[in-house]
Amino acid sequence: MKLSKLALAFAFGAALTTGVQAAEDGKYSVFLITMDQIDQHWVRMNDGAQKAANELGNIDLTWMAPDIKDDSKQIEVVNNAVAGGADVIMIAANGPTAISSSLKEANAAGVKIIYVDSPADFPALKTLATNNMAAGETAGKTLLKHLNDKGITEGRIGIIGVNAATNSTVSREMGFRTAFANTNFELLETQYCDGDTAKAKDIAANYYNLGCIAVFGTNEGSTVGAGNAVRESGGEMVGIGFDKSDMVLSLVKNGQLIAVMAQNPDVMGYEGVKTAEKAMKGEDLGEEYVDTGVSIITKENVEQFR
């Protein structure tokens, strides 16, 4: 059991641990590592994790993340967590391949690995995430129905991704494209915004200039950017996307987004910490993969999610 603790200015909490017994203070050290600390998606995940830690009373939880979505910076955060005495690392991998060697080294050092939201290639004890392929297909079907209901059966559609490596958003894109198979709609090549709202807005505006009638955002940043571009288009293009933040909900309420697929990051964080404690105690962890589900938020039900 590791006894040291990491004191870092950019960390917000405490930590998880790997072993059989708790540290001398009676707590297991758990590190939650997300892609950044900007998106409300990650804030809600930390809220859920902290709730579980407070309920259990034997978890020392630390939330750490790079300032931007970047593989090398996330690898550095993982290494800092290991050096700081992590027993368990809960991580949303920015890139499934890039981070895997660091996770392998962490595991070899005795750190237990749990994935939340976005897994890497290295095998973990458990993954708590959205079934992103299915959720992406649901987004596609929702948009397809909206267009068909308006008598629109063909046209160009743009897709804004985060990057080409993030497993979760790539799977959403694949599911979205599946929904439009065997239709007369043309789905253009995906453009990437690195989760940056301003960059996503520019991409969406370019799609509009290319004659797109709709645009799909695969995460919070790309969805906000898409919604802002739709607003500036005067409603000649429609948007649909992912995640639930105050800005996203406002865009839905005001009609710039016809719908968003709301994940449950708080559930991922909460159940991740519960899983970490069970792992430390040597208890059965159940299924290796848990789908934490999505809700479809539209203008009609948006107030229920505020």
Residue ranges of each PLM-predicted region?
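Short, low-complexity disordered leader/linker segments with a strong preference
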Residues: 1-29, 54, 82, 104-111, ...
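Hinge/cleft segment of the Venus flytrap/periplasmic-binding protein
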Residues: 24-27, 37, 156, 160-164, ...
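Extracytoplasmic "Venus flytrap"
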Residues: 28-48, 52, 56, 61-78, ...
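Short, solvent-exposed amphipathic alpha-helices that sit
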Residues: 41-55, 135-142, 167-185, 225, ...
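Hydrophobic alpha-helical
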Residues: 78-108, 176, 189, 193-251
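Hydrophobic alpha-helical segments within soluble ligand-binding/sensing domains
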Residues: 27, 74, 128-154, 198-201, ...
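Short beta-strand elements in bilobed, periplasmic/extracellular small-molecule ligand-binding domains
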Residues: 55-67, 156-161, 177-197
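Flexible loop/hinge segments that line or gate small-molecule binding clefts
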Residues: 96-134, 150, 245-258
